[in-house]
């Protein structure tokens, strides 16, 4: 593993063109302004380098000199510590713990619903779609209180949530009624960030082709 990693003089991200976890990491890299190379990986055709570096052959996988990491949250926290500015986690331990809990809940609850919409039966997908829409609208008031997710500053929690919100049209979810204004305002603020725009692959841009 170390020999293969050492062949790369530039930080390299193995990334899926539409993989939501890869998208999280791409946002962090763009936010940090890090110079890196990207290797786009097709799901059923991993390159030999990835096979050699990661026994799971999963994306995202980050190679930084002799270090190889996989699992998006591990990569994101590593990048935030490796490149401290701008910070994407709070300074104080209590706030950091809360942020980690928010990321866990987003993945456990909302990403699970997303996967059910994509992979479940028609009835399962309909139920998950309804639940995800209702839960997002239920928390919408928090987006009217702060520019970002319970914070004045863009954070790793936003890097978790934004890729999911970007994919909502593809999931068949739209918003109207109470909470929609706040939620759409948050989405606009995040989607217009230079780092978010830079993070998008061509395939991800096409998810919202023709939409504002």
From Swiss-Prot:
Cell membrane found in the keyword field: no
Q: Which residues form the GST C-terminal domain?
A: 92-209
Gene3D superfamilies attached to this UniProt entry = 1.20.1050.10, Glutaredoxin
Looking at the UniProt entry, the stretches that span the membrane are: none
Query: Its induction, per UniProt?
Result: By amino acid starvation.
GO CC terms on record?
cytoplasm; cytosol
Q: Which UniProt keywords apply?
A: Stress response
Q: Which InterPro entries match?
A: Glutathione-S-Trfase_C-like (IPR010987), Glutathione-S-Trfase_C_sf (IPR036282), Glutathione_S-Trfase (IPR040079), Glutathione_S-Trfase_N (IPR004045), GST_C (IPR004046), GST_Omega/HSP26 (IPR050983), SspA_C (IPR034342), SspA_N (IPR034341)
State whether keyword Translocase applies: no
PANTHER family found in the cross-reference section? GLUTATHIONE S-TRANSFERASE OMEGA, PTHR43968
Q: What does this protein do?
A: Forms an equimolar complex with the RNA polymerase holoenzyme (RNAP) but not with the core enzyme. It is synthesized predominantly when cells are exposed to amino acid starvation, at which time it accounts for over 50% of the total protein synthesized. It is involved in the transition from P1 early to P1 late gene expression. Rnk and SspA can functionally replace P.aeruginosa alginate regulatory gene algR2.
Q: Known NCBIfam families for this protein?
A: PRK09481.1
- Family as reported in the entry's similarity comment: Belongs to the GST superfamily. HSP26 family.
State the protein's name. Answer: Stringent starvation protein A
């Amino acid at each position: 593993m170390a020999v293969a990693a050492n062949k790369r003089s530039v930080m390299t991200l193995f990334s899926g063109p539409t993989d939501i976890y890869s998208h999280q990491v791409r946002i962090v890299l763009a936010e940090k302004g890090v110079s890196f190379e990207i290797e786009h990986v097709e799901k059923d055709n991993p390159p030999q380098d990835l096979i050699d570096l990661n026994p799971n052959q999963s994306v995202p996988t980050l190679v930084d000199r002799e270090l190889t990491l996989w699992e998006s949250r591990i990569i994101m926290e590593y990048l935030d510590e490796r490149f401290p500015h701008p910070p994407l986690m709070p300074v104080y331990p209590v706030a950091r713990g809360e942020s980690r809990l928010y990321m866990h809940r987003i993945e456990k609850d909302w990403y699970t619903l997303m996967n059910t919409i994509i992979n479940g039966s028609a009835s399962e997908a309909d139920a998950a779609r309804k639940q995800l829409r209702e839960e997002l609208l239920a928390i919408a008031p928090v987006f009217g209180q702060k520019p970002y997710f319970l914070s004045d500053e863009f954070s790793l929690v936003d890097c978790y949530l934004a890729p999911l919100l970007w994919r909502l049209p593809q999931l068949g979810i739209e918003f109207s009624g109470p909470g929609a204004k706040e939620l759409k305002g948050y989405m606009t603020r995040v989607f217009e960030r230079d780092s978010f725009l830079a993070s998008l692959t061509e395939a991800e841009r096409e998810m919202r082709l023709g939409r504002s």
